Amino acid sequence: GVDSGVVLKKAIDVLGVNNVKPVVVKSELFRNEEFYQAIELVRSLGVEVLETEMAELEDDNIVKNTPESWYFSKRLLYGKLNEIKEEFNFNYILDGMIMDDLEDFRPGLKARDEFGVRSVLQEAHLYKSEIRELSKQHDLPVWNKTALCSLASRIPYGETLSLSLIHISER
C-alpha cells in the first residue's frame, strides 16, 4: 500500500537495495490482487522481493473472529517476519503503521510491540495525507491508492471465518 511503499522507498534510499529485504505476504484474508500489486511495486523499485504465505484460517484464535483475532493475526504475521529477519540476519522489521492508525482499535499493536517491530512512519509522526504527498513526490504508483483492509473486517464479530465466507465478503 501507500504507507509500506513509502517505508520501502525511504529504506532503499537510506540503506541501499542490498540492505533491505521487502517481504510480501500472501494472505487468505486479503485480495490476491493486493499481493500481486505489492510485488509489482517492490520490483519497480529495483529490489529483490521475498514472497511468503500465511494460513490464518488454520489458527482457531483467528477463525473465532473476535476483536482479539486481530492480535493473533498480527502475531502470526510478525512471527513469520521475525523468522525471515533472523534467517537473513537483519536488525529490524519495519511496518507501515501511521499516526492515523492510533485513532482506531488496534489489538495488533500488542503483537507489534512483542516482536519489536518498528513503525517508522509513526515514529516520524506522519499522517496519511503526508504519506500520500511523500509517495507522490517519489513517483510511487500507489500514491493515490485507496486504503486496503482485511476481508475479515467485513464479517461481523462472532461469525466463524471460513474461506467461503471470505470469498463472499470479497464481492
Task: Give the label of every model feature segment.
Residues 155-163:
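C-terminal scaffold of the Radical SAM
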Residues 164-171:
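Residue-level detector of conserved catalytic or cofactor/ligand-binding positions
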Residues 136-156:
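Histidine/lysine/aspartate-rich catalytic loop segments that bind and position anionic ligands
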Residues 1-137:
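ATP-dependent adenylation/nucleotidyltransferase module used to activate substrates
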